[in-house]
């Protein structure tokens, strides 16, 4: 078996997230323009989070929103933020992959628009207790719904070196995945893998520190593990598969993605001219002013399409 030399490294954590990235919804005005909410319209915010996008939709008098999130803490924050909206907002604790079941339980056959802001929120990244980020020490958890499922550490311990390497390559597009996986498994086997910073140290041992001004070397590995722990791509595909059935003709689907794996899935799903009419030829990205105030917006891409045809288009 190939063994990677493990050199003790006492690395400081990366700098804290800039203040401008705290709990800010991205592409808010662009989402509003795409959805074009109408009075008495019903919309789904499939990733409610802190309620930023929903608050924007509610600027339209009479518009109603069904907000879905699997993070109970996020739902509590959104409830407090949107309290003045009263019964114009319905809160659902659950996964958006089960959106048809959620809507059926509410007696809502179809909606006028659906928004999904895919991936981890800045609110989750900024909470060390969630274990999503390498910027601060926290447990190796990474679950969006902390009430169920296995943690990132449990996943690492369950997988073989080869399985972990394949996961990191597939979901993190990390070309040095085998070296990274070996270092991670060595740390786990020796009891040196407990926290997020332990994981970052293991990755740095495998690939070396970041270049000045470069992307942190642990970024791809953390992304891969988070996607796997939460089944993010499977969740997205299930949502997109259901979208034509739950969005009424003339309604709009708007999806914000943050990396190429997500964007490719969305782009492929919208390539059905009998079902979707794209609202823009290319994805919408954030302007310089938004990126300056919220650096997370730099990688955001919004794809939006209008639902065309009726039930016959789905046959």
From Swiss-Prot:
Keywords: Cytoplasm, Methyltransferase, rRNA processing, S-adenosyl-L-methionine, Transferase. Its EC number is 2.1.1.199. One of its GO terms (molecular function) is rRNA (cytosine-N4-)-methyltransferase activity. GO terms for cellular component: cytoplasm. InterPro entries: RsmH, SAM-dep_MeTrfase_MraW_recog, SAM-dependent_MTases_sf. The keyword Methyltransferase applies. It comes from the Bacteria. It is found in: Cytoplasm. Residues 1-21, 281-315 are annotated as: Disordered. Belongs to the methyltransferase superfamily. RsmH family. Specifically methylates the N4 position of cytidine in position 1402 (C1402) of 16S rRNA. This is Ribosomal RNA small subunit methyltransferase H. The lineage of its organism: Bacteria, Pseudomonadati, Myxococcota, Polyangia, Polyangiales. The gene is rsmH.
